[in-house]
Amino acid sequence: MSREVTSGLPQDKPTGSAPPPPPPWRRWLLPIGLLVSLVLLFTFPMRPSSGKTLTYSEFLTALHHHDIKTITIHSDGEASGQFADGRPYSTTIPIGLAGSQLLNELENNGVQISARPPGPSLASQVLAGVLSFLPFLLLLGLFAYSGRRAGAGFLAGLPGIGRARAKIFTTERPQTRFSDVAGYDGVKAEIAEVVDFLRSPERYRRAGAAIPRGVLMVGPPGTGKTLMARAVAGEAGVPFLSVTGSSFVEMFVGVGASRVRDLFEEARKHAPCIVFVDEIDAIGQRRAGAGTIVANDEREQTLNQLLAEMDGFEPAQGVVVLAATNRPEVLDPALLRPGRFDRQVTVPLPSQADRAAILRVHCRNKRLAPDVDLDAVARATPGFSGAELANLVNEAAIAAARAGRRDLTAEDFRYARDRIILGRREDSNVLLPSERHAVAVHEAGHAVVAACSENADPVERVTILPAGRALGVTFQLPLAERHLYSESYLRDSLAVRLGGRAAELEILGEASTGAVNDLSSATELALRMVREYGLSPRLGPVSYPVGGSMYLPGGQELTPRPYAEATQQRIDQEVADLLRDAEERARDIIRRNRQAVDELASLLLEQESVDGAVVYQLVGRPVPTPEEHREAAARHVRRPGIAAATGASMAGGSEPRTAASSDDLL
């Protein structure tokens, strides 16, 4: 059973029959009465006391005795002023008598005369008062409407603002099981072991083992961390509390720490249990140092409370915290130490075998045509996460439905892969004839250089059909999973990326802006070879990694440069030399295989897409096989003097995408 936690004191239920509720209109009487009173108060303010009230005869008598000093005549006949001794008075001048004769008499007696223009009418005063209170009325109505929609008014929700927004699963659990999580056998074993700790604690206590306090799952987005938590909730025989890290953040100070306390109080009531915190980096970021100018006291208070609850003076017994994040580098070290998060489980991008298993799970309720080989689809999608594979199957199903078929074909999966990587395809006729020829030459250059390079990934397909910003694409697929990249492989990769530009220079006589994406990716790879991988003889075996997220590519932290300006100049020179050497190698391959490039460009103009086997036939080389790849890989790894980029691939821990190169549309 799933319910929302808003813990508090239990309320006694009435035993007798409750009186009937008042009619709805009565609850509006008091607010309307107060509003009318305020309107009248501000519309008709009390006039100050006007002193002694005189009749018109008494006023004339005082005027003749020179007792009147000033007079102010109103448009409605009312008059007020001061006596000679300064006392105020008021009187009413009859209509028709406040003429020139009275004015002459007032002037003859030395009275200072003033007049007041007519004021607004009663209706206009009431209207002005209502309009002045209209914003207040609208705001009051908005609060009333929101309160009715939420089941309680704004003020009614304030007492529970410090309560944790956690969902508790006790009896009715999610339908997800570990069998629904394909692949990741090691990760599932670690997570299942924690569940077994809580199911059978005595077995571990007899061996002297302590139950881990926390398990942190880290990995790129879309790899199934939250899915793994849902599987734990479905498999666990203990209560499961689920909450997101952002739910602790609120506009009121102290609310985050209060919600952490309330969450663990609720967890202790259900112990033994599991607390799952998704996106824990929202509250677990590293605290500011002593000299830091910018700090977030509210977030740090929330983090401090979380640290105390997990392993403080009174730690939570029988409560295991399961958390997930794709930004482990920003978490506070105190949160990651043993005793809080005893285990860190990495959920990486799936391997080829894992991708095949994930595809089989998502294809359970779909009909596949005989030509569909899910192992081949898995090999064609290196670097895809579990979420992207689910999207791949869904896009293939959409393509089949669009064509009026129930069975998913291999072409549907190829279309879905291209759409995810590149975007929606366009017709090549959108290009000018000269542009279409330039794109064909460009892609032919990529394909021929890749086919003639010993260490490059094999060419799978070449196309000049525009998709997204790409005007053409050369697809390369590795024959096996790569975990280390040798220097020879990286240098051949540079030559392949610059092969399109080299073909333009050799055949067309000039380069174009279509190579901008190739230049960008080649420069980035060369920079990492020199600065991070230690593959520069001039710079030596040093590594200056660029700060940024481990699993979120694209962002870079503003960190101080750990080397001198002279070192930066050497890095720039080495990068330029690597790129020049790669371009010269690519141009040499194009010159030696000019006929193959011309024939492939003609085939692309005619067919728009050419299979990789045709490319190898044109250059006179056999299509690479997995056995040849394994022999070559073993030969390159054992070769002396060849350095490998250890610890991470050239994509920062993830496999490269299948689209090796593309023309960019500017």
UniProtKB/Swiss-Prot annotation:
> In the UniProt entry, which residues are flagged as the active site?
E443
Please describe what this protein does.
Answer: Acts as a processive, ATP-dependent zinc metallopeptidase for both cytoplasmic and membrane proteins. Plays a role in the quality control of integral membrane proteins.
Q: Which family does it belong to?
A: In the central section; belongs to the AAA ATPase family. In the C-terminal section; belongs to the peptidase M41 family.
Question: What ranges are annotated Extracellular (topological domains)?
Answer: 49-125
Q: How does it sit in the membrane?
A: Multi-pass membrane protein
Q: Where is this chain's protein located in or outside the cell? A: Cell membrane
Cofactor(s) needed by this chain: Zn(2+)
**What's the name of its gene?**
ftsH
Native species? Acidothermus cellulolyticus (strain ATCC 43068 / DSM 8971 / 11B)
Q: Which SUPFAM superfamilies match?
A: FtsH protease domain-like (SSF140990), P-loop containing nucleoside triphosphate hydrolases (SSF52540)
User: Which Gene Ontology molecular function entries are recorded, alphabetically?
Assistant: ATP binding; ATP hydrolysis activity; ATP-dependent peptidase activity; metalloendopeptidase activity; zinc ion binding
Source species taxonomy: Bacteria, Bacillati, Actinomycetota, Actinomycetes, Acidothermales
Cite the ranges annotated as topological domain Cytoplasmic.
Answer: 1-27, 147-666
Q: Where is the composition biased (Low complexity)?
A: 641-653
Amino-acid positions noted as binding ATP in the UniProt annotation, renumbered to this chain: G219, P220, P221, G222, T223, G224, K225, T226
Enzyme Commission number(s): 3.4.24.-
The protein's matches in NCBIfam families, at most eight in alphabetical order, are given as:
FtsH_fam
TM ranges: 28-48, 126-146
* One example of a Gene Ontology biological process annotation: proteolysis
Which Pfam family is one of this chain's hits? Answer: FtsH_ext
According to the UniProt record, one GO cellular component term is: plasma membrane
Which protein is depicted? ATP-dependent zinc metalloprotease FtsH
